[in-house]
A protein has these predicted regions:
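One-carbon transfer enzymes
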Residues: 1-183
Length: 183
């Protein structure tokens, strides 16, 4: 099941237990298992924020959320540029000097340009993946605050037009980080 391995997975149980937040854990990463279907059918939802989810979310799950399911995807351009996997890694590898983190509303396609808001940060020569992830987390928090404010005001506006062309980042694995000093 290597193809289903989630890169850098860390659960949120430490935070959810601390703050008494109920959690549902699906039996299938594709959200198509009977347990998930029953949970979705038995509950009503208004809004969701997903972080680090690396799969499409089925329409029958998305349709259960009145205001939508929102996720993050970044790149050096504007969605749909840089769809796909490991965008922060690719931005560093390609020598990009900026990273646009988009908070977008999920639909049935990967990383669609249904953008609620974008926040940009610089990538410098001194950044590595750890410092870039830290900057990314700060932007994520800011974007979630904006979304929750708009949600409370019942005023979530999503733009679907894009300034950029469609392109894809390929999946990276641990083997891609190996350096052969003999070549």
């Amino acid at each position: 099941l290597e193809r289903n391995r989630v890169s850098g997975f860390k659960g949120l149980s430490v935070l959810t237990e601390k703050y008494g937040i109920p959690v549902f854990e699906a039996d299938s990463y594709f959200l198509t298992d009977d347990k998930t279907k029953a949970f979705m059918a038995e509950n009503e939802f208004e809004i969701a924020v997903s972080m680090g989810w690396q799969r499409l979310i089925p329409p029958e799950v998305l349709d259960k959320f009145t205001y939508g399911v929102y996720g993050f995807h970044g790149n050096s351009g504007y969605l749909p540029f840089g769809r796909g996997r490991s965008p922060l890694n690719w931005s560093i590898i390609l020598g990009d000097t900026r990273f646009n983190l988009n908070l977008f509303r999920y639909d049935e396609k990967a990383d669609s340009p249904n953008v609620f808001a974008t926040e940009m940060f610089s990538i410098t020569l001194h950044d590595d993946i750890r410092t870039a992830q830290y900057k990314n987390m700060i932007c994520s928090k800011n974007l979630i605050k904006k979304l929750l404010k708009a949600y409370r005001e019942k005023n979530i506006a999503v733009r679907t037009e894009s300034k950029d062309f469609d392109s894809w980042y390929q999946k990276r694995t641990a083997a891609d980080g190996k350096i052969d000093f003999h070549e």
